[in-house]
C-alpha cells in the first residue's frame, strides 16, 4: 500500500520482469523470483513463474470471448489438451464466473472483466501472482470473493500472492504482511496489526486505516483500550462491549444527548422540479445481457445519491440510459425535462457531465489547460473565455496548466477530468467509481469537490463500490440487484437493513455494521451512528456516566 506515486506499480513491474525487460531505466540491485534473477533470464521465462494482473484490465485482454481468454495462456504455455478443459472449468468455478464462459468480453462490466483476468492467470498456475489493484472495479462481495480465492490459491496451490491494493480493510483481514511505500521506499512493514497501529503516520502520507482501527486508536489515546489494534468489526465489537459499563445494556432506551442521526437531504433539494426522472424504464441488450427492469427514480437539484449493488446489477446500464447513450425499450427517461429517446445524445450532454472510472478514457488534449477548456469550447464558448474559465478552475484545483495530462500521476489525471466536469457547470454529474485507483488523500479531495458541487445545486449520481465513501458522502442510496431497484432511501437506514444488504450482495461500511451490532447487543445509544468519532464519543460518554 501507499499513496499515488509511491512506487507500488513499479515494484509490481520489477517482480514480473517488466522492469527491466520492458520498462527501461537505471536499475540497481537484484530481484530474485523462485531462485532466478529477473535480469538474467528472459521475460518469457519470468512469465512462466510470475503471473500478473494489471491495473488497466482492458490492456491485458487478448480475446473477444471469455473462454478464449482462458485458453490463450494455457495453450501458449503448452499445457496438455487433456488438462486444459479441467483447468478452465475449475478456475471459472473458483472465481465464480462459470456463467460468463461464452460471453463476449466487450459486453462485460468492469468488475466481470477483472474476474476474467484473474481467472485466466490463476489457470496457468504461476508460482507467484502479482496483482495491481485487482478489486478496483469490484463490489464489496466480489472483492471479498477475490481475496478468498487468492487465499485459497496461496494455501492449496502454494502460490505466493503480492497485492497492490487501496482497500485496507481487506488487506488487514487477508494478508500475512503489509508493506507501506512512500517516495519509492519502504516506510513501514510488518503484520497488519503492527502496521495499522501507526494511524497518524499512515494518514500523513495519504494511506487510510480500517475504520475500526481508527476507533481503537482513539480509545487507546484516551486510556480506554490497549494491546493489539482492532482490524475487523468482530474485534471492535468485543472491545467496546468490554469497555462499556455493564450497567449500559440493550435495555437502555435513551441515547446520550446529541447522538447523531443520518443527515437529512438538503432542505432545498425537493423544493424544485426534478432534474432526472426514470419512469418504469425497461432495457435489454441485443445479446440478452445486463437488462434493467421497471426502473423508477427521481433526482433533485443538490442531491448526492449513491447507486450500490454487485457487479452486473445494472448500475452501468442505468447511467448509460441517463446520459442518452442507451434508449429505453419502454418507459421514459427525462433529463431536465428532455425525453432522452426524443433528442440526440449531444443535447443531453449539455445537461449531464460524466466522470469516468478511468480518466484516461476522457482525456484527449495535449495540455491540462486545453483539456479543461475543451468542454466549454464544444458548448460554443469563445476560446478566450473558455481558457479564462478553465484557468480559474485549474488554479482552484492546484493543477499545472501547461503540463501534458499523461505526464501526471493517476490521481492528478482524475483531478484533471474532474476539473473538466466542474468547469462546464452541469445540472447533473454522473460519477463512475470516482475514487478508483486514488489514495486516501486524493479520494477525499475528489469527494469534497463533488460535495461542494452538490451544495451549489448540481445533482450528483454516484456509482461506487467503496461503501465507506458512499456512507460518508451520499445522502440517499439506491440499492440494485438483477437489473431492478430493490429499495431507495436514507443511506444509514438502508445500510443497516441486513436483509436488504444480503439480497443485494452489498457489505455495509464497518462503522454502520458495528453500530447496528452495538445498538442490538450493548445499547440503543449506538443506533444511527455512521462516523468513527461518534462511536468513540458515545463509548466515552457511557463510560463517564458509569
Regions found by a protein language model. Name each.
Residues 1-3, 308-310:
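The feature captures the beta-strand-to-loop junction immediately N-terminal to the Walker
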Residues 16, 323:
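Helix-to-loop junction immediately C-terminal to a conserved catalytic motif
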Residues 25-36, 331-339, 348:
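Conserved ABC transporter NBD signature motif
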Residues 82-100, 384-401:
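Conserved ABC ATPase "signature" region
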Residues 104-108, 112, 404-408:
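Conserved ABC ATPase signature
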Residues 129-132, 429-432:
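Catalytic Walker B motif of ABC-type/P-loop ATPase nucleotide-binding domains
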Residues 184, 482-483:
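Conserved ABC ATPase "signature" C-loop
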Amino acid at each position: 500500500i501507499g499513496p499515488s506515486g509511491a512506487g507500488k506499480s513499479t515494484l509490481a513491474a520489477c517482480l514480473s520482469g517488466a522492469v527491466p525487460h520492458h520498462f527501461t531505466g537505471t536499475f540497481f540491485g537484484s530481484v530474485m523470483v523462485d531462485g532466478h534473477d529477473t535480469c538474467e533470464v528472459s521475460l518469457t521465462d519470468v512469465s512462466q513463474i510470475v503471473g500478473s494482473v494489471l491495473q488497466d484490465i482492458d490492456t491485458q485482454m487478448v480475446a473477444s470471448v471469455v473462454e478464449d481468454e482462458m485458453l490463450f495462456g494455457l495453450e501458449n504455455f503448452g499445457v496438455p489438451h487433456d488438462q486444459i478443459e479441467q483447468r478452465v472449468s475449475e478456475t471459472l468455478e473458483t472465481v465464480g464466473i462459470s456463467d460468463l464462459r461464452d460471453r463476449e468480453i466487450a459486453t462485460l462490466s468492469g468488475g466481470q472483466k477483472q474476474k476474467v483476468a484473474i481467472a485466466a492467470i490463476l489457470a496457468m498456475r504461476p508460482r507467484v501472482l502479482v496483482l495491481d489493484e485487482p478489486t478496483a472495479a469490484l463490489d464489496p462481495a466480489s472483492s471479498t470473493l477475490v481475496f478468498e480465492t487468492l487465499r485459497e490459491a496461496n494455501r492449496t496451490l502454494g502460490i505466493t500472492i503480492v497485492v497492490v491494493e487501496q482497500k485496507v480493510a481487506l488487506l488487514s483481514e487477508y494478508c500475512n504482511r503489509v508493506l507501506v511505500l512512500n517516495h519509492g521506499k519502504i516506510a513501514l512493514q510488518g503484520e497488519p496489526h503492527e502496521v495499522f497501529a501507526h494511524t497518524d503516520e499512515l494518514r500523513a502520507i495519504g494511506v487510510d486505516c480500517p475504520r475500526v482501527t481508527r476507533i481503537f486508536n482513539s480509545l487507546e489515546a484516551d486510556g480506554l483500550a490497549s494491546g493489539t489494534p482492532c482490524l475487523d468489526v468482530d474485534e471492535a465489537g468485543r472491545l467496546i462491549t468490554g469497555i462499556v459499563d455493564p450497567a449500559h445494556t440493550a435495555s437502555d432506551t435513551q441515547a446520550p444527548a446529541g447522538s447523531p442521526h443520518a443527515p437529512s437531504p438538503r432542505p432545498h433539494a425537493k423544493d424544485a422540479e426534478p432534474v432526472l426522472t426514470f419512469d418504469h424504464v425497461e432495457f435489454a441488450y441485443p445479446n440478452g445481457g445486463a437488462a434493467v427492469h421497471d426502473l423508477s427514480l427521481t433526482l433533485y437539484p443538490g442531491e448526492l445519491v449513491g447507486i450500490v449493488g454487485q457487479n452486473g446489477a445494472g448500475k452501468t446500464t442505468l447511467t448509460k440510459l441517463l446520459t442518452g447513450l442507451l434508449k429505453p425499450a419502454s418507459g421514459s427517461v427525462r433529463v431536465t425535462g428532455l425525453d432522452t429517446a426524443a433528442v440526440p445524445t449531444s443535447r443531453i450532454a449539455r445537461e449531464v457531465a460524466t466522470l469516468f472510472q478511468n480518466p484516461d478514457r476522457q482525456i484527449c488534449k495535449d495540455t491540462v489547460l486545453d483539456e479543461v477548456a475543451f468542454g466549454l469550447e464544444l458548448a460554443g464558448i469563445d476560446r478566450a473565455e473558455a481558457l479564462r474559465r478553465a484557468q480559474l478552475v485549474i488554479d482552484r484545483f492546484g493543477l499545472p496548466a501547461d503540463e501534458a495530462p499523461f505526464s501526471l500521476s493517476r490521481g492528478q489525471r482524475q483531478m484533471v477530468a474532474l476539473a473538466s466536469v466542474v468547469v462546464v457547470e452541469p445540472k447533473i454529474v454522473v460519477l463512475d467509481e470516482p475514487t478508483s485507483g486514488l489514495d486516501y488523500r486524493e479520494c477525499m479531495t475528489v469527494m469534497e469537490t463533488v460535495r461542494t458541487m452538490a451544495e451549489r445545486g448540481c445533482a450528483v449520481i454516484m456509482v461506487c463500490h467503496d461503501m465507506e465513501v458512499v456512507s460518508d458522502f451520499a445522502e440517499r442510496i439506491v440499492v440494485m440487484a438483477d437489473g431492478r431497484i430493490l429499495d431507495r432511501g436514507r443511506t444509514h437506514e438502508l445500510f443497516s437493513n441486513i436483509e436488504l444488504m444480503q439480497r443485494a450482495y452489498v457489505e455495509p461500511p464497518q462503522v454502520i455494521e458495528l453500530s447496528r451490532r452495538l445498538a442490538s447487543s450493548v445499547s440503543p445509544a449506538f443506533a444511527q451512528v455512521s462516523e468513527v468519532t461518534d462511536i468513540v464519543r458515545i463509548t466515552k460518554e457511557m463510560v463517564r456516566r458509569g
